[in-house]
Amino acid sequence: MAAAAGSRVFGLLGRSRLQLSRCMSSGAHGEEGSARMWKALTYFVALPGVGVSMLNVFLKSHHGEEERPEFVAYPHLRIRSKPFPWGDGNHTLFHNPHVNPLPTGYEDE
């Protein structure tokens, strides 16, 4: 009984391999089918994916502002061995005073 089931599975696998080789060997018909497949993937997978991502961003933006964590002056963070070459030398290039603390703490506190 196990041998019969094994031969059925092998027959199905062999048949699917034959169908796959036929699809891969088709020349001119493959280009039209490929274009149709990519068009369908664009409309039914990519565009709904973009829509779901937009909805996620919209819902997250209306969720509310989170409180920032309390500043803890760890000795291994925000080490300044020499000043930055711009501004006052203490702010990074893309410094945000509401999010990025200086070595002494947040600026707007």
Curated annotation (Swiss-Prot):
Question: What's in the GO CC field?
Answer: mitochondrial inner membrane; respiratory chain complex IV
Pathway in which the depicted protein is active? Energy metabolism; oxidative phosphorylation
Transit sequence range: 1-24
The UniProt record lists the keyword Membrane: yes
> What's the main place this protein lives?
mitochondrion
- Keywords in alphabetical order: Membrane, Mitochondrion, Mitochondrion inner membrane, Oxidoreductase, Transit peptide, Transmembrane, Transmembrane helix
InterPro entries the record matches? Cyt_c_oxidase_su6a, Cyt_c_oxidase_su6a_CS, Cyt_c_oxidase_su6a_sf
**Topological domain, Mitochondrial matrix: which ranges?**
25-34
**A Pfam family hit:** COX6A
Extract the CDD domains matched here: Cyt_c_Oxidase_VIa
- Membrane topology, as annotated: Single-pass membrane protein
Q: Which residue spans belong to the Mitochondrial intermembrane compartment? A: 60-109
Query: Where does this protein reside within or beyond the cell?
Result: Mitochondrion inner membrane
Q: Where are the transmembrane segments?
A: 35-59
> Which GO biological process annotations does it have?
mitochondrial electron transport, cytochrome c to oxygen
- What exactly does this protein do? Component of the cytochrome c oxidase, the last enzyme in the mitochondrial electron transport chain which drives oxidative phosphorylation. The respiratory chain contains 3 multisubunit complexes succinate dehydrogenase (complex II, CII), ubiquinol-cytochrome c oxidoreductase (cytochrome b-c1 complex, complex III, CIII) and cytochrome c oxidase (complex IV, CIV), that cooperate to transfer electrons derived from NADH and succinate to molecular oxygen, creating an electrochemical gradient over the inner membrane that drives transmembrane transport and the ATP synthase.
The annotated subunit structure for this chain is: Component of the cytochrome c oxidase (complex IV, CIV), a multisubunit enzyme composed of 14 subunits. The complex is composed of a catalytic core of 3 subunits MT-CO1, MT-CO2 and MT-CO3, encoded in the mitochondrial DNA, and 11 supernumerary subunits COX4I1 (or COX4I2), COX5A, COX5B, COX6A2 (or COX6A1), COX6B1 (or COX6B2), COX6C, COX7A1 (or COX7A2), COX7B, COX7C, COX8B and NDUFA4, which are encoded in the nuclear genome.
Q: Which family does it belong to?
A: Belongs to the cytochrome c oxidase subunit 6A family.
What this protein is called in its record is Cytochrome c oxidase subunit 6A1, mitochondrial
The source organism is Bos taurus (Bovine)
